[in-house]
Amino acid sequence: MANSAQARKRARTALKQRAHNASLRTAFRTAVKKVLKAIEAGDKAAARVVFQASEKVIDRIADKGVFHKNKAARHKSRLSAQIKAMA
């Protein structure tokens, strides 16, 4: 239990930030799933459009520090490779 006023405030702030980060991670997962769904459907044009939207989400999460920038780059690279591999 936080004893000082500063520690109590940091505990409150941490809870708020944890909830915000959770929503960002959820947005990331949703964006990736949309791209994968478009890839499975075989629609390359739609996959590109959805991928561009998901890139923004992934970059934003990396900038905020929720994910490491290398993890974000890895996800973008793998999704891009899957789109390029489509016939």
Swiss-Prot record:
Family: Belongs to the bacterial ribosomal protein bS20 family.
Job description of the protein: Binds directly to 16S ribosomal RNA.
HAMAP family: Ribosomal_bS20 (MF_00500)
A GO CC term attached to the entry: small ribosomal subunit
NCBIfam families on file: S20
Alphabetic keyword roster: Ribonucleoprotein, Ribosomal protein, RNA-binding, rRNA-binding
InterPro entries (alphabetical): Ribosomal_bS20, Ribosomal_bS20_sf
Region annotation Disordered: where it falls in the sequence: 1-20
Transmembrane intervals: none
Example GO BP: translation
Biased composition (Basic residues): 7-19
Pfam families recorded: Ribosomal_S20p
Name of the protein in its database record: Small ribosomal subunit protein bS20
Superkingdom in the source lineage: Bacteria
GO MF terms held by the record: small ribosomal subunit rRNA binding; structural constituent of ribosome
